From Swiss-Prot:
Keywords: Acetylation, Cytoplasm, Nucleus
Gene Ontology biological-process entries: ascospore formation; chitin biosynthetic process; DNA damage checkpoint signaling; DNA replication initiation; mitotic cell cycle; negative regulation of apoptotic process; negative regulation of protein ubiquitination; pre-replicative complex assembly involved in nuclear cell cycle DNA replication
Keyword Acetylation: yes
GO molecular function, one term: phosphoserine residue binding
Stretches the record annotates as Disordered: 236-273
SUPFAM superfamilies from the UniProt entry: 14-3-3 protein
Residue stretches in coiled coil: none
Protein name (database record): Protein BMH2
Record's compositionally biased regions (Low complexity): 245-261
GO CC terms: cytoplasm; nucleus; plasma membrane
């Protein structure tokens, strides 16, 4: 018996409850590849599925990279460092496969079938996110390519969001949150990151009284994350200005901080209501 679209969505929900996210991905990928535009619920299920699958690997990569840094500073640990690097490479292969998978679905099916401004922003934001994840661990030409692709997708999403979504819309706020993380972590541009986050926060504050009751919780949650990142980043900028003589040491500390305590970002695409 062939599996219907409704069956795939139901099985994806079942897989989510069972925390079997790889199967959730497969079911939602089947829905996404149908050529029909996804509903808001289907869109969120797809986002949750891929974010759980890749989120576990991103967390693993940060932990292993942190251990690698510590071992590199020790004497007589060359063999252990080689083992760690091989293990990190295995995780990076998995990260690449997952990212390439969803990026292919986005380019082949989801973006071409999107008809509303909301869905276009959602998918271009996703495209920016997954290229950013590739840039997190890549180097050389691969990092440059992933960085440029992420920037282009985020810019496209921002242009559409500015004209078609209000400043308080959860998807527009989530885009600003993740785009600012891109500037801070990938492009090492704290000034751009702070400017973008502050602008999004201020624009939303100015129209807070227009928020509907159903969107209020989602929007204010993301606004809090924007403010949390601004607090973290502005303190980093202040410290760097006061400690120019210890610049090299501070850069190492910042790298460790990024691996162990990353800035807040929107991890589930559009919050479910």
């Amino acid at each position: 018996m062939s599996q219907t679209r409704e069956d795939s969505v139901y099985l994806a929900k079942l897989a989510e409850q069972a925390e079997r996210y790889e199967e959730m991905v497969e079911n939602m990928k089947a829905v996404a590849s149908s050529g029909q535009e996804l509903s808001v619920e289907e869109r969120n299920l797809l986002s949750v599925a891929y974010k759980n699958v890749i989120g576990a690997r991103r967390a693993s990569w940060r932990i292993v990279s942190s251990i690698e840094q510590k071992e590199e500073s020790k004497e007589k640990s060359e063999h252990q460092v080689e083992l760690i690097r091989s293990y990190r490479s295995k995780i990076e292969t998995e990260l690449t496969k997952i990212s390439d998978d969803i990026l292919s679905v986005l380019d082949s099916h989801l973006i071409p079938s999107a008809t509303t401004g909301e869905s276009k922003v959602f998918y271009y934001k996703m495209k920016g996110d997954y290229h950013r994840y590739l840039a997190e661990f890549s180097s050389g030409d691969a990092r440059e390519k992933a960085t440029n692709s992420s920037l282009e997708a985020y810019k496209t999403a921002s242009e559409i969001a500015t004209t078609e979504l209000p400043p308080t819309h959860p998807i527009r706020l989530g885009l600003a949150l993740n785009f600012s993380v891109f500037y801070y972590e990938i492009q090492n541009s704290p000034d751009k990151a702070c400017h973008l986050a502050k602008q999004a926060f201020d624009d939303a504050i100015a129209e807070l009284d227009t928020l509907s009751e159903e969107s209020y919780k989602d929007s204010t949650l993301i606004m809090q994350l924007l403010r949390d990142n601004l607090t973290l980043w502005t303190s980093d900028i202040s410290e760097s200005g006061q400690e120019d003589q210890q610049q090299q040491q501070q850069q190492q500390q910042q790298q460790q901080q990024q691996q162990q305590q990353a800035p807040a970002e929107q991890t589930q695409g559009e919050p479910t209501k």
